[in-house]
C-alpha cells in the first residue's frame, strides 16, 4: 500500500462510517439528553454519603438539577429548580421540586431517573450486569470515602 498524502487523508472513505459530527453537534447532544439520558436510570451517589437524616446530594442529569435527600420517608429524589449550582446551594426545601423515581440498589448506589413513568426497575434495566460482583457489593455495607 502506498503512503497516504494530504489529499488521501481528507477524502471520505468508501465505507460506511459514523461522522465525527455526532460528537460535537449541539442538536445531537440535545436529542441524546431528551431521548436517552432523561429516560434511563443514572447512579447518582452512594447511600453512605447521606446516612444521616437531612443529608442530601445534588447533581445534574440530562441538564436537569436533581437532589437526593435522606428524609423521614427514606431516600427521595427531586427535580429541583432551586439549586443554584450542582455544588448544592439550596434556596428552598427540596420537597418543592417534582419528585422523581429513585431506588437504592447494587451495593447501595442511589439510582434516579427523570422519566415520570419508567417502564423498568433498576434491576430490570441493569439486566444482570451486576450479577458477577453481587456477592462482593451486596454482602456487607460499603462506605464511600474521599481523599481530600
Outline where the language-model segments fall.
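Rieske [2Fe-2S] iron-sulfur-binding subdomain
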Residues: 1-76, 88-148
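Short cysteine-rich loop/turn motifs with clustered Cys
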Residues: 78-85
Amino acid at each position: 500500500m502506498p503512503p497516504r498524502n494530504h489529499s488521501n487523508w481528507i477524502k471520505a472513505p468508501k465505507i460506511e462510517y459514523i461522522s465525527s459530527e455526532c460528537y460535537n453537534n449541539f442538536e445531537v447532544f440535545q436529542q441524546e439528553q431528551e431521548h436517552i439520558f432523561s429516560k434511563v436510570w443514572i447512579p447518582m451517589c452512594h447511600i453512605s454519603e447521606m446516612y444521616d437524616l437531612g443529608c442530601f446530594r445534588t447533581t445534574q442529569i440530562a441538564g436537569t438539577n436533581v437532589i437526593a435527600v435522606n428524609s423521614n420517608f427514606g431516600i427521595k429524589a427531586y427535580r429541583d429548580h432551586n439549586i443554584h449550582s450542582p455544588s448544592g446551594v439550596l434556596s428552598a426545601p427540596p420537597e418543592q421540586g417534582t419528585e422523581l423515581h429513585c431506588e437504592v440498589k447494587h451495593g447501595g448506589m442511589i439510582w434516579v431517573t427523570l422519566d415520570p413513568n419508567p417502564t423498568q426497575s433498576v434491576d430490570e434495566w441493569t439486566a444482570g450486569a451486576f450479577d458477577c460482583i453481587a456477592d462482593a457489593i451486596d454482602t456487607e455495607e460499603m462506605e464511600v470515602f474521599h481523599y481530600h
